[in-house]
Amino acid sequence: MSEPLVAERRLAVVGAGPRGVMLLERILARLEGAAPDAHPRRLRIDVVDPYPPGPGRVWRTDQSELYLMNTPAFFPTACAADNPGLRPSTAAQTFDQWRRVHPEASLGVRRRQYPARAVYG
């Protein structure tokens, strides 16, 4: 017996910086949580960015530490916060959790201070 045809879906993510990576993480978390009996679908994801995946242009790690984020350290995150309506994150920590574990890497920034963009990258 032949296998049923599986429809392929395509998705283009423009930007492989923190937002693009966060979007990919949420898609993967959703797919991991899909019911096993759900119709199998193939998903092709194309990521488009002139820079390598990771910090992107804005969050480059080689820029001056004088360039600050426009939000305090407790606000930005690369993973979904605990929220009953969301699937658990596949990422390990929020930025705030990370900076508490790695004070030397986060330049000792405190919860309500504005970290350098390079630190977030």
Which role does the model predict for each range below?
Residues L5-D46:
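N-terminal Rossmann-like FAD-binding beta1-loop-alpha1 element of flavoenzymes
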Residues V48-G121:
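Glycine-rich active-site loop/strand segments that organize a redox cofactor
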